[in-house]
Amino acid sequence: MKRRPRRKRKALDIILAVICASSLAAAALIGWTIPHEGAVYSEISAEAGSAEGGGIDWEALRARNPDISAWVSVEGTPIDYPVVSPREGDPQGFYLNHDFDRNWSFAGCPYLDPRGTADGRHALVYGHHLNFDSEMFTYLRDAWRQEKFDTLGDMYWSTPAGGTVRLHPAFSLSVDKSFAGIQRFDLTDAAETRAWLADLSAQAGARAE
């Protein structure tokens, strides 16, 4: 009667050891993959040029991936990435786990909500919050707090048709992706856009002075 518990304990120890080994292997894989993907985006950034430096090489980016729609960078943060538009036939959220080269990726690639356009009044960009502060949109995870919001510099938003626009952050709020306030893509004029922004600002956790 005493042997069975020992067999069970031994089996449990083996299972736990396997789980532990698997977890360590996964951690090692993630630990290698994220810096590797960061290097890939550094390479793309070097090839594309800089919005702050005067221009983006859209031809080079299109040659690498025709899904390119914009480039976003934010002063004072590591954010400096191409922004893509999923192509017809891509599964929903394709770029959440595929990089700019359309290879499988933990970090993914920032991409536009297909209901908007890069040069429209409302361009909603999706990007990951990872456990690495220097990757994707992780720096923005606490930007709805005033003290973090105040560290954000100006944003450069570049598109092939519109050139580069320099924008100052106006406010920030933390909401679910289904939040009704960010589902507006039918804004027709400046007055309607200002009213929409004023409504969002009233709900914000942080605002510019």
Task: Pin down the residues of each PLM region.
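N-terminal Lys/Arg-rich, disordered targeting/topogenic segments
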Residues: 1-11
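Sec-dependent N-terminal signal peptides
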Residues: 12-22
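Solvent-exposed, non-transmembrane regions of membrane-associated and secreted proteins
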Residues: 23-209
